[in-house]
C-alpha cells in the first residue's frame, strides 16, 4: 500500500523521546517494531577506517540504498575520495571501479549472513536475530550530533564473527529506531565508523536503483 507523502521518511517511525531511562528491552522492542514495517532505506553515509598502529584515518563518502526482502538488496555508491559502486544482490557482490572500468565479482553463497552481520546490522534486524549472534548490552544514551542517542554494545558469539570483530557499538536513533552510527572494533584495535544521515525510510526504490551502470566495454573479474 502506498504511503501518503506526509508519512514518508524517518518521521513515520517517530515517537516521543523517552523522559524515563530506557532499558535494553525498550530499545530492542522499538527496533522490532521498526523491523516489522521497514521496506526501504536510503541515506547519506560516511565510512571512516582507522588503523591505530600507524595512526592512519581514511574516509569515504557516498550514499546507501537498501531494499528489504527475502534476499535483501543493497547498493553503496561512494563519491569521495574516489568513485566506487558496491552492489549486494542474490548472494553476490559486485564492486565497480569506474577509473579502470572494471567490475569485481564475489560469490557470497557461503556467507549469506554477511550483510546482516556487518553492513546492515541494525537495519531491520529483529532482536531474536541480534541476540542469537551477539551478547547485547545497553550502554545508555550518549550525545551524538546534539541528540541523546541510545547505544547498544554487541559482542559476537560465533567464533568466526568473533575472529573478525571484538565488538560493535550501535547508535540507535530515538526517532526512527534505526542505526545512525555503527562502530566496528577489531581485536587489533583498528576500527570502522559508519555514519548515516539524511535518512529516508520506506520511499519507493525501484529495481533500476539496484543496478550498476558501467561504461561500455567494462571488464568483469571473478574474485572467488
Identify what each model region corresponds to:
Residues 1-17:
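Bacterial Sec-dependent signal peptides at the C-terminal "C-region" and cleavage site
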Residues 22-95:
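N-terminal mature ectodomain segment of secretory-pathway/periplasmic proteins
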Residues 63-65, 84-85, 135, 167-171:
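Short, surface-exposed charged micro-motifs
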Residues 22, 104-106, 114, 118-119, ...:
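Gly/Pro-enriched, hydrophobic low-complexity segments
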Residues 72, 91, 101, 175-177:
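Beta-strand-connecting loop/turn residues
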Residues 6-11, 33, 177, 185, ...:
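Mature, folded catalytic cores of secreted/periplasmic enzymes
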Residues 85-124:
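Hydrophobic, well-structured mid-protein blocks that either form specific transmembrane helices
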Amino acid at each position: 500500500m502506498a504511503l501518503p507523502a506526509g508519512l514518508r521518511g524517518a518521521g513515520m517511525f517517530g515517537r516521543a523521546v523517552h523522559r524515563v531511562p530506557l532499558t535494553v528491552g525498550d530499545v530492542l522492542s522499538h527496533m522490532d517494531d521498526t523491523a516489522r514495517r521497514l521496506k526501504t532505506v536510503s541515506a547519506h553515509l560516511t565510512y571512516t577506517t582507522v588503523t591505530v598502529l600507524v595512526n592512519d584515518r581514511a574516509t569515504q563518502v557516498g550514499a546507501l540504498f537498501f531494499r528489504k526482502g527475502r534476499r535483501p538488496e543493497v547498493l553503496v555508491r561512494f563519491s569521495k575520495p574516489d568513485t566506487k559502486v558496491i552492489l549486494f544482490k542474490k548472494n553476490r557482490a559486485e564492486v565497480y571501479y569506474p577509473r579502470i572500468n572494471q567490475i569485481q565479482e564475489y560469490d557470497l553463497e557461503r556467507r549469506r549472513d554477511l550483510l546482516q552481520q556487518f553492513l546492515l546490522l541494525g537495519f531491520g534486524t529483529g532482536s531474536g536475530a541480534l541476540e542469537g549472534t551477539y551478547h547485547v548490552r545497553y550502554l545508555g544514551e550518549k550525545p551524538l550530533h546534539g541528540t541523546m542517542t541510545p547505544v547498544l554494545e554487541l559482542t559476537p558469539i560465533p567464533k568466526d564473527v568473533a575472529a573478525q570483530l571484538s565488538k560493535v557499538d550501535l547508535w540507535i536513533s530515538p526517532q526512527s529506531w534505526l542505526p545512525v552510527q555503527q562502530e566496528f572494533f577489531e581485536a587489533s584495535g583498528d576500527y570502522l565508523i559508519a555514519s548515516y544521515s539524511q535518512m529516508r525510510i520506506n520511499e519507493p526504490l525501484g529495481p533500476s536503483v539496484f543496478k550498476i551502470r558501467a561504461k561500455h566495454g567494462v571488464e568483469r573479474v571473478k574474485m572467488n
